[in-house]
Amino acid sequence: MSGKRDKLAQTRLYGIADLGYLEEAALEDSVAALLEGGVDLIQLRAKNVAEGRILAFAQRIAPLCKAAGVPLIINDLVSVARQSEAAGVHLGQADGPLSSAWSALGHGAIVGRSTHSVLQARTALRQGADYIGFGPLFPTPTKEG
C-alpha cells in the first residue's frame, strides 16, 4: 500500500475549512482548532472566491498543516494545490478528470471526488479516486440537497 493510501486508511476525521462559513480573519485560528481537535486531513474550500485569494489562504494555512503532519487538500483548483504544495485536491463532478490532477500534481498527490449517486461513486472508483465524498444529503447555505 502506498503512503497516501496508508494515510487515507487511517483517516477518521476529515475537516473542512470553508470560507462560506468562516470569516477570513478567523481562518488560521479555525484550522489550528481543527488540528488541535485531532483531524487527520483538512480541506480548504472557498466557493466564489478568486483563485489568487484562495492561493493566499492556502499559503497561510499550509505551514500549520505541515507542522501537524496533516495533509492539506484544496477544493476544486489543481493549480492552487500545485502552487501551495498541498497534499492534493478534491474535485467536483465538473472539475475535470482525475488523471489531469495527477498529471499536474504527481501520482503521490491525494485526489478525491465528490459524488451524488451510486453511479458517480462507482465511476470515481474505476478512475482511481483516492477517496470519494458523498452528498450533500440535505441542503446547506452553499450546496443544494
Feature annotation, model-predicted:
Residues L98, Q120, T140-P141:
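Short glycine-rich, flexible loops that bind phosphorylated cofactors or substrates
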Residues L44, A81, F138-E144:
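A short acidic, helix-capping loop that chelates divalent metal ions and anchors anionic groups
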Residues M1-D95, S103-D130:
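Conserved N-terminal beta1-alpha1 strand-loop-helix module at the mouth
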